[in-house]
Structures are given as C-alpha cells and as structure tokens.
Amino acid sequence: MFDFGLGELVFVGIIALIVLGPERLPEAARTAGRLIGRLQRFVGSVKQEFDTQIELEELRKAKQEFEAAAAQVRDSLKETGTDMEGNLHDISDGLKPWEKLPEQRTPADFGVDENGNPFPDAANTLLDGISDVMPSERSYASAETLGDSGQTGSTAEPAETDQDRAWREYLTASAAAPVVQTVEVSYIDTAVETPVPHTTSLRKQAISRKRDLRPKSRAKPKLRVRKS
C-alpha cells in the first residue's frame, strides 16, 4: 500500500527503539500492526464500495438504454396505430350516412304481410310449383276432358248389361270403402293379492342376536407325542 522499502523500515525501527526503548517497542509494534490492518481493511472496503458503485452505474446506464429503446418502440407503435385510426376515420367519413346502415328488410321481402299472412301471389306460386311437381294428374284431367268432349260428339255406346253393372259396382265399392275389422276388447278388473311380508317376532330376533354374540369356540389342534 505504502511505497516503503527495506531500508526505510529498518530506519523507522531504529528510531522507534531509541525513542520507546526495548520494553515498550513490542507493544508499540503490535499496536502499529493493528492500526495498519484496520487501515488496510478500510481501504479494501472503500475500494469494494467504489467497484460496487461503478457496477451499479453501468447497470443503471444499461437500464436507461433499454428503457429508451422500449420507449422508442412504444412511440413507433403508437404512431402506427394513430395513422391506422386516421385512415379508418377518413374512409368512414368518405361514405354517406345512409351507406353505413345495413340493408333494411320488410315482411314483403319474405312474401308475407304485416300480420304474417302470405300474399296471394306467393300462394299462386306455391300452387304452380305443386302442379309442376305432379304433372300426371293434370294430364289425366285433360285426358278426361278430351274424352268427355269426344263422347258428346260421337254416338252413344250401347247400354251395359246387368252383369257388367254389378261387377262395376262391386269394384267401386271395394275400392272406396275397405273393410275394417273391429276388435272388441273388454277389461275385467281383477284384485291383485299382495303377499303378506314375513315378519319374525321380537323374541326370535333377540334369540338370534344372542346366538350371534356368543363367542365361537375354535378347535385346538392336539399334538401327538410318540412314546419311545
């Protein structure tokens, strides 16, 4: 710590021996050693404190740089968000107020009036669709109409016989009114006899409990001893 050489130390020791004497010199040397040790520890602690402060300063600088970079990124993101909001506001302001509203629907768009009843046009459209689905019936009706007109224009056919009339009535009656067999079901009330539950008397229950509480005797094994 101090720039003392061997000659300086010998010179200081001679002066201390002359001033203090041989009796007080060892105690003075121990005191000087303790003081020098305290001084060295103090210098070491001061040096460590300086090193700690330097490290803290470096960490503080790094923290400040990191915070500055984070603030810069935050500002750039905020500017980007502000620009996007401004563009959206410009686009929305460019539209007319009625263009912003969704398309309004009325009951007429669904083919019904205010009370929920379908329009006649919708009913006719439904009937037309049904007639398109079943064209055979319409062709059958037109064929019957043409047949009737042809019969009126042509000569009348001869009257059918009694046998033909009876056969036709039988077929039409069987086709129009099918026979339905009815089955009569009668219900007879019968009393159901419920079995009487089997209940044991209190005396029998007490006897069975006592029998269960009795200690059960166990057979002890018997050892056989052979006689010599």
Swiss-Prot record:
Keyword field contains Nucleotide-binding: no
Spans annotated as Disordered: 138-162, 195-228
GO BP, sorted A to Z: protein transport by the Tat complex
Keyword Glycosyltransferase attributed: no
GO molecular-function terms, A-Z: protein transmembrane transporter activity
Transmembrane segments annotated in the record for this chain: 1-21
Cysteine disulfide links: none
Key words of the record: Cell inner membrane, Cell membrane, Membrane, Protein transport, Translocation, Transmembrane, Transmembrane helix, Transport
GO CC list: TAT protein transport complex
Membrane topology: Single-pass membrane protein
Pfam families per record: TatA_B_E
Principal subcellular localization: membrane
Subcellular location per the Swiss-Prot or TrEMBL entry: Cell inner membrane
UniProt biased composition (Basic residues): 206-228
InterPro entries to which the protein is assigned, alphabetical: TatA/B/E, TatB
Family indicated by similarity: Belongs to the TatB family.
Subunit-level organization: The Tat system comprises two distinct complexes: a TatABC complex, containing multiple copies of TatA, TatB and TatC subunits, and a separate TatA complex, containing only TatA subunits. Substrates initially bind to the TatABC complex, which probably triggers association of the separate TatA complex to form the active translocon.
Function comment: Part of the twin-arginine translocation (Tat) system that transports large folded proteins containing a characteristic twin-arginine motif in their signal peptide across membranes. Together with TatC, TatB is part of a receptor directly interacting with Tat signal peptides. TatB may form an oligomeric binding site that transiently accommodates folded Tat precursor proteins before their translocation.
The protein, known as: Sec-independent protein translocase protein TatB
Name of the gene: tatB
